[in-house]
């Protein structure tokens, strides 16, 4: 009896790990798109996390800040330091190149979304 429970428990655990890994892969591709969408105007990191969370996109600082630096190094974002208050804040905004990339990515995302939605609807029939 214990062996059966252990086997079922391990299967469930493995399935949960698989689901978590696949969910992370889905999010990894979507997060830069979400960040570019949200940076149409200057925002600092902490405020951006709040707005993303409000929009339904959970992201922690350990994910966001490396992504912001990477997107900036790719020329998709611009940043500036603003000192007004207790401490300086680095503000980010989408660059002209970032707007072009966002327009292309948006089209790709919509196309992919339609295809996946169609495939899911076929399964549900």
Could you describe each region identified by the protein language model?
Residues 88-106:
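Basic, amphipathic "hinge/linker" alpha-helix immediately C-terminal to the N-terminal HTH DNA-binding motif
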Residues 22-65:
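N-terminal helix-turn-helix DNA-binding core of bacterial DNA-binding proteins
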Residues 20-24, 79-81:
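Short beta-strand/turn micro-motifs at beta-sheet edges
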């Amino acid at each position: 009896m214990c062996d059966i429970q252990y086997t079922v428990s391990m299967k469930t655990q493995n399935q949960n790990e698989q689901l978590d890994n696949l969910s992370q892969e889905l999010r990894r591709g979507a997060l830069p798109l979400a960040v570019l969408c949200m940076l149409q105007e200057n925002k600092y990191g902490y405020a951006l996390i709040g707005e993303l969370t409000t929009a339904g996109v959970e992201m922690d600082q350990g994910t966001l800040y490396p992504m912001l630096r990477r997107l900036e190094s790719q020329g998709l974002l611009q940043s500036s330091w603003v000192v007004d208050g207790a401490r300086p804040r680095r503000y980010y905004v989408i660059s002209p190149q970032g707007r072009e990339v966002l327009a292309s990515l948006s089209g790709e995302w919509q196309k992919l979304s339609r295809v996946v939605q169609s495939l899911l609807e076929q399964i549900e029939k």
